Regions:
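Conserved acidic carboxylate
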Residues: 8
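Active-site residues of response regulator receiver
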Residues: 52
């Protein structure tokens, strides 16, 4: 079973993403901060990452920079879900494979993005 790590500090959104990931046939875990994400990546070895860009402790950009600096993590598939108005072109230098707008995304869009990055 594929594994997806969710980095999200809003418990409602985290549960919703877990549901979508479960519906896509994958297992998931949730952390609320970039530092926790790095620990979980080392311990759990997820196949993909779903990242909120606006976290209480810091922005998702800090985690993206950290992942990019680790050769063994540079190719980890990442889906950004946020309300910030970010485009895939903005995130391409970080290796982000999909960008979903929380205010308009549908379950079908989440499933499609997950299917594409988990292939």
């Amino acid at each position: 079973m594929k594994k997806v790590l969710i980095v999200e500090d809003d418990p409602v959104w985290a549960k919703l993403m877990q549901y979508y990931i479960s519906e896509a046939g994958a297992d998931s875990r949730v952390v609320i901060a970039p530092g926790q994400a790095l620990e979980m990546i080392d311990d759990w070895h997820p196949d993909a990452l779903v990242l909120d860009m606006l976290l209480a402790s810091e922005t998702g950009v800090a985690l993206l920079n950290e992942l990019k600096s680790h050769e063994d993590l540079a190719n980890l598939p990442i889906i950004v879900c946020s309300n910030v108005g970010i485009t895939r072109d903005d995130m391409e230098p970080f290796g982000v494979r999909a960008v979903l707008d929380k205010s308009t995304m549908t379950p079908a869009q989440v499933r499609q993005a997950l299917t594409e990055v988990l292939q």
